[in-house]
C-alpha cells in the first residue's frame, strides 16, 4: 500500500484465491472453519459501523462495516443518502432529488461482516469512525462451525449486485489501512 490519498472511486477488486486451504479459528464458545472463496480488496468510505457482542457470529465477527465507493463515497452525495445498520443488516434511504438512483447505491455499497485475522486488526477496527476512508484486504470466506453444540453456517456474497439475505460479504481481513495507518 502506498500512502497517497485513498482512491474510493474504483470498484472493489475480487480475484480467484490461489488456495482454498481452510482457516481454522477456535474461540471460547466454538470452533470454525473458513473456506476462502476469493481474494478481496475494498477501498471506500465507512458510511456506517455496528459492533456486536452477543451470539455466535459476534464471537468471530464483532464488527460490521457498511462501505461506499464510487460517486457514493463523494462528500457531496452525503446529503442525499443516509445509512444505518442493525441485526447484521444495513439499510439506506435516499432523497428523491438524489442524483444517484437505487441501483447505483446498491452497486456501490456493501455490508461487510468483518472477521479480523489478527488482534492488531481487531483493535484497529474498533477505532474506525464513520466518514473515514479505508482499504481492507483479505479473503471472502464461507464459514462452517460449531457453537455451543450447535452447527452454524455463514456464506459470503461474491457479487456487489445482490440484495437481501445472503448479500453481505463475509470478509476475513488480513490488512487494513485507515487514512495513513496500516495494520496487519
Task: Report each predicted region and the residues it spans.
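OB-fold and OB-like single-stranded nucleic-acid-recognition modules
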Residues: 1-184
